[in-house]
Amino acid sequence: MRCADDAPSSDRGPGGGRYGARGARILGTGSFLPGLPVTNDEVIAAMGGDRTTSEWIEAHTGIRSRHWAPSGMATSDLAAEAALRALEAAGVCASDLGHILLCSTTADWTSPAAANRVQELIGASCPAEDKQVACASWLFGLDHAARLCATGTDPVLVLGADIKSRFVALDDHRLRPVFADGAGAVVLGKGADDDQGLLTVRLVSDGSRAMNLYTPAGGSQLPASERTVADGLHFVHMAVSGREIKQHAIEIMAGSIRWVLDEVGWGIEEVDHFVAHQANLAILKGLTEELGVGVERWPITIDHTGNTVAATLPCTLDEVMRDGRVGPGDRIIMTTAGAGYSGGAAAYVVPS
């Protein structure tokens, strides 16, 4: 079969049409970080060695502390806490929700969907489902939710939640200090097409690099066994250098941001806030340099949250909306990149 365009999605230019789910509104946000902050010194002590220092971790990742979920707490527990806070902020009852999307790489089980447990915990009765696109999960979920709203299913609860600390080897000095736990939530509702709310979303997937950063075991390709556990194959593995992952992440986010700006007709200087996934501070700084945008327009949360994977974007949104840094009329670009490779960007105007 001959196809009109065999180029990967990351190489395709703007579609030239209006975003089909344009105008969806964020009605409320919420977030939850479990337990007490875990300092760099505590991470080093947990690793049981002297392969790194607190100063090295902060200098290379930007992280001073992060949160790790206590034993007995599952991803759905974190998600439910964030959900209740977002529902309260939105003034929406759980019983009025039209759909729940739980975006996560660390669902409670392989089956059923952990979103079903969230539904039960918050007292909802609507359809609920999981979405897994690594660190880009929540942005993919936001696009899905906006399309649900556009077709009459609203409001939609979009959750990003992960307990990634349990999927990193204890002695992995590169990743153990970085990955953390948390949950963020947004209640999304339908809005008018009046140049406010969600204006467009760009999503990118590049399966040719799927094995660069992945968890080898636990799925259908390599089911759990005594050997996979003994070999540590249920932990995150980096098959390429951190430098290469950084370069690819910057390429995905910068390209997606430029596409979105072109689609909505904004100059980069017209954006008030860039809310980005924060895998580490070096990637974020590299992105600001690539785009020529001062770091003051990029809210930084990784210093006290670590990399919360799918929770990063909604947690950062919740923080800046609650502390007053974001106000009516502000133009926001959201962007992310993660394993898969997957990523993208979105343009949002805070409704007046």
Regions found by a protein language model. Name each.
Residues 2-71, 172-247, 251, 255, ...:
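Condensing-enzyme catalytic core mediating Claisen C-C bond formation in acyl metabolism
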Residues 27-30, 103, 132, 156-162, ...:
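Short beta-strand segments
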Residues 50-58, 109-123, 158-164, 224-230, ...:
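Acidic-glycine-rich active-site phosphate/pyrophosphate-binding loop
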Residues 76, 80-83, 87, 106-107, ...:
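Claisen-condensing/thiolase-fold acyl-transfer catalytic domains that form or cleave C-C bonds
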Residues 37-38, 111-113, 168-172, 343-347:
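Short acidic, glycine/serine/threonine-rich loops at helix termini
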Residues 95-103, 268-277:
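Short glycine-rich phosphate-binding loop at a beta-alpha junction
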